[in-house]
A protein has these predicted regions:
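Residue-level signal for secondary-structure boundary elements
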Residues: 25, 37-45, 106, 262, ...
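Boundary detector for helix-to-coil junctions that initiate low-complexity/charged tails
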Residues: 1-33
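Extended, charge-enriched "interface" segments that sit outside catalytic cores
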Residues: 36-160, 167-171
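Short, hydrophobic/amphipathic alpha-helical patches that form generic packing surfaces
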Residues: 24-35, 71-75, 179-183, 286
Length: 318
């Protein structure tokens, strides 16, 4: 069976008009024509490092003086378990439910957490791989390829070398395992798991300056990471290991996550949105609901709710 000849420009244009309509086609053409200009302007904006949030920036985000930042951070810590359905008082009941309804699952969860404490990960078909004492968040540990951690996220390449999978560092940096560590810390009472969760969050923030490196190249993963961090913080909120200094650092990074997402939403030139855009919105919704004290939060929440309602009409066809 012979391959079909590629469509010429006129045929492609006609096909596009038939599929999305004349007005949408015109809008897409304008967006494509303006793309180089928009890209240059966005790059210039990004290089001014607008997303990084230092302590003074965090105080401004909370609308408090630097002297009052400690109290603002403490208010967030106390509020998180109420904003997400986490109740330390129900631990005994949860353990009983595990034993009755899912025998062996709690033990398996602890075993998984122990492997994570040993920096052993099994991602995307890799099989168990020990990553060593210090986790390299920028490396595809399946192929050994490492992305430049200082590179602007706009310049991060993928699909450029055979056998290299950018999704490996992305999957690791989503932080799903941090929630498991926090969960295990809560259910067992053992400080080992909370300590490891806190150490990995610290290491990630230090190794991944906002907007630099492979782990900022996909906004969807930024959003997923923010959600997982918020859950981990809510579960660990009662831990004495969660110090004000540490929580301040994490909250500053979460504010940076929110600002990054608002500035890098995943919408195609033709206006088509996908699961990536939905993930961006859910990340903003979580940040808006969980960090209500932050001045940006109401805008994040309002935008996310409005767009999620619109996307349900666009993306859910059943």
């Amino acid at each position: 069976m012979g391959s079909e000849a590629p469509l010429d420009f006129a045929a492609r244009l006609l096909s596009k008009v038939q599929h999305i309509g004349l007005l949408a086609t015109v809008r897409m053409g304008i967006r494509k024509a303006l793309r180089p200009l928009r890209s240059r302007r966005h790059r210039a904006h990004v290089l001014r490092q607008p997303y990084r949030v230092a302590r003074l920036d965090l105080a401004a985000a909370f609308g408090v003086t630097p002297e009052d930042l400690t109290a603002a951070v403490e208010r967030v810590r106390l509020a998180l378990p109420q904003r997400l359905p986490v109740s330390p008082e129900s631990v005994a009941e949860i353990r009983a439910l595990y034993k009755k309804q899912a025998p062996g699952v709690l033990e398996a969860t602890v075993e998984s957490a122990d492997r994570i404490c040993g920096h052993v990960f099994d991602l995307l078909g890799s099989g168990p791989v020990a990553l060593g004492t210090t986790i390299d968040w920028h490396r595809d540990f399946k192929s050994g390829y490492r992305w430049n951690p200082d590179q602007c996220f706009l310049d991060v390449a993928h699909g450029h070398e055979v056998g290299v999978d950018i999704k490996v560092p992305w999957e690791l940096s989503r932080g799903h395992h941090l929630v498991l560590l926090a969960q295990t810390a809560l259910l067992t009472g053992a400080p080992t798991y909370a300590r490891e969760c806190i150490a990995q969050l610290t290491g990630w923030i230090e190794a991944n300056p906002t907007g630099c490196g492979v782990n900022w190249a996909c906004p969807m993963d930024v959003a997923i990471r923010a959600v997982n961090w918020l859950w981990a913080l809510a579960v660990l909120a009662g831990s004495p290991l969660m110090t004000e200094v540490w929580l301040t650092e994490v909250l500053a990074s979460l504010v940076a996550h929110g600002r990054f997402l608002m500035d890098n939403l995943e919408v195609r030139d033709d206006g088509v949105t996908t699961n990536h855009y939905l993930a961006d919105l859910v990340g903003l919704l979580y940040l808006g609901l969980c960090l209500k004290e932050v001045r940006d939060a109401e805008g994040w929440k309002a935008f996310a709710v409005r767009e999620l309602v619109r996307e349900m009409d666009r993306q859910v066809l059943a």
